[in-house]
């Protein structure tokens, strides 16, 4: 089956034991184009019908059984077609030193019109599972507004939301809740002032985007939160760009991955990077090729600007931030410096407002790590 993406949180140790639970899930489209989905009345999210494959079952047998139990629908077995798979890996919160590994097999299919009574387990009853018909993008929007606190459910919802977006021909975008979870998990792996910097970048990006009619403030905020996510993997230089790009790209978050790449290169030139070139030549070549293929949009430019005015203790004048970088590293490329000044003028013109007034200083963001 064709892999759609791999949602690997990488919040576990290499030595942890993997507990595997393969699952089959149904993409059931009805005549009017809506999907038959399971809705949680308690937590207010949608999931694809389906669940774990039992020993001795093949995938389609498990699919039919799980759909019947969760929705009361009978799948037409001759309609079942492979759609794609998603591998999910994250730390298992129920058992110490274990990893929850779940290969999710998605199938398109149709169902009989008759609906039987559900046969829910205790967890499903407690969650208020019920059958609902809804358009894929509407379901994705509901899921992105969901503020469930449980990390396990959060990743499950993010997984199915990404599949809904792919099914609709869209590039998956993380929700605010998912972006916050990924940042907190990253900071737990590598605590440091980069968390505060990321939060100030996100907050200023959201404010500026809110003053630009063609930009989405929530999307800008999410990109700001995740632009430095590669620092999850340790104290590094150029490696954080490479690692962050691949971490998000593997999850299917192509646009967020792009920001993790472009935020360090306001001129699309890898030679402008300030810091250690601590990745192999093939990885440097990959970055250069990726940059060459990208036509920067306003989100790329916005995060570049906000990254350049955000320190760990707040928003500062652009020149102050660049001088701080120059002092720490001993240099700052003049063309990169000039490009940042151009970005400031560009967004001030779009907003018809002075940059620092728009970006604000705000109170110190809530943090989960320690410098």
Where are these regions (language model features)?
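Conserved Nudix-box catalytic region and its N-terminal flanking loop in Nudix hydrolases
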Residues: 30-70, 74
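Active-site flanking loop/helix segments enriched in acidic
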Residues: 18, 176-197, 226-232, 266, ...
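Acidic, metal-coordinating catalytic segment for phosphate/diphosphate chemistry
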Residues: 1-27, 31
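Active-site-adjacent beta-strand/loop module that shapes the phosphate/pyrophosphate-binding cleft
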Residues: 87-118, 132-137
